[in-house]
């Protein structure tokens, strides 16, 4: 029914318009409910999250949002103070396919990129072989400053805009361990749904990650509605292509200059460094923190310094839909319980991970 709204003062006509509009909305709603299109928008908040546990993370999050958005309540938090920080790998995006995406990109650069592999140094090859060794046995490599430095070095002289396209081209290939999915599509659907739900409730979202900032921005693009300035990752030195060996204090950027990587690491954004970058780039203590490992505990502790703060950690306990690790998940859950972090079980709290059409490859 088409309703033309005239700006009359007449109360009776206005009331008639409202009733007709309401009837149209009911009809549209019924038609929408009868639509079998699998891409329809779910109206239920966090519909991809399980309801099996009344005390589970879904109920905790929904109740929390209700409390902090109630302007008449004691726990109301103004919109400008609603900040949530998310780790990336293992929190929003898969880290076991079979290892971190930026690590796989690094191995490709060293082992397979015909424009670079012959230039790779012994240090870079050693770091790539270490990453490959752990990936082959289904483990994540230990945190290693030497590896982080090597990962910065391989992009020396690459333009900033080039690494974006370089990453995009790599992640546009089929997933290594899953059917019906590309490398860049391995986002956890329940977490994407959570981010959108928080945004609808006026949360400002930041990604605080150990992945290189520029690589992460390329991966996130097209999947999440998050500004590039809100993606805070591992930091490397950026220079002008005409700067050569001059310090930034001794060089003035020119209109025809372009930005490129110097190939030097500034800081790997893990542990206390996450707190540093949150303080430096955001300037406020977040309300919510989401992570999946001990390297996220520092920003979790920071969030818990907020009077209304909460910290959540994801457990890698799904060994059917994901490449989980039950022993690791159990140990981490015990640690989370001791520190009052709320745990999210990939196995129990998510109805799906990547979508029903995505399956693990037999040999993965």
Regions found by a protein language model. Name each.
Residues 4-11:
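Sec-dependent signal peptide recognition
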Residues 40-48, 161-364:
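C-terminal cap/substrate-recognition subdomain and adjoining C-terminal extension
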Residues 13-16:
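Low-complexity, intrinsically disordered or signal/transmembrane-proximal segments
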Residues 22-24:
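N-terminal Sec signal peptide cleavage junction
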Residues 37-247:
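Alpha-helical substrate-recognition element adjacent to the catalytic core
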Residues 27-35:
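Ser/Thr/Gly/Pro-rich low-complexity, disordered linker/stalk segments of secreted
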């Amino acid at each position: 029914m088409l309703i033309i709204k005239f700006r009359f003062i007449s109360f009776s006509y206005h009331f008639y318009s409202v009733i007709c509009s309401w009837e149209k909305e009911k009809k549209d709603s019924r038609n929408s409910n009868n639509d079998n299109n699998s891409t329809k928008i779910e109206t239920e908040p966090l519909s991809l999250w399980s309801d099996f546990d009344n005390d589970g993370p879904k109920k905790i999050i929904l109740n929390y949002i209700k409390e902090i958005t109630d302007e008449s309540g004691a726990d109301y938090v103004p919109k400008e103070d609603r900040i949530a920080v998310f780790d990336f790998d293992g929190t929003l995006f898969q880290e076991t396919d079979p290892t971190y995406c930026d690590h796989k990109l690094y191995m490709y650069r060293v082992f397979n990129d015909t424009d670079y592999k012959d230039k790779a140094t012994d240090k870079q090859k050693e770091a790539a072989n270490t990453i490959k060794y752990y990936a082959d046995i289904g483990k994540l490599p230990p945190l290693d400053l030497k590896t982080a430095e090597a990962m910065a070095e391989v992009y020396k002289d690459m333009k900033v805009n080039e690494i974006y396209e370089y990453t995009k081209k790599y992640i546009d290939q089929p997933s290594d361990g899953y059917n019906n999915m590309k490398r860049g599509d391995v986002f956890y659907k329940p977490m994407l749904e959570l981010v959108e739900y928080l945004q609808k409730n006026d949360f400002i979202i930041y990604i605080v990650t150990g992945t290189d900032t520029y690589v992460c921005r390329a991966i996130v693009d097209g999947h999440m509605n998050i500004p590039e300035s809100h993606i805070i990752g591992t930091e490397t030195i950026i220079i002008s292509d005409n700067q050569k060996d001059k310090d930034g204090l001794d060089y003035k950027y020119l209109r025809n200059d372009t930005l490129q990587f110097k190939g030097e690491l500034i800081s790997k954004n893990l542990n206390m460094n996450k707190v540093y970058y949150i303080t430096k780039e955001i300037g406020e203590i977040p309300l919510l923190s989401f992570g999946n490992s001990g390297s996220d505990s520092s920003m979790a502790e920071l969030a818990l310094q907020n009077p209304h703060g909460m910290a959540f950690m994801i457990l890698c306990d799904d060994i059917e839909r994901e490449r989980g690790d039950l022993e690791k998940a159990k140990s981490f859950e015990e640690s989370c319980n001791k520190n009052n972090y709320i745990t999210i079980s990939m196995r129990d709290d998510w109805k799906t991970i990547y979508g029903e059409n995505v399956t693990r490859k037999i040999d993965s």
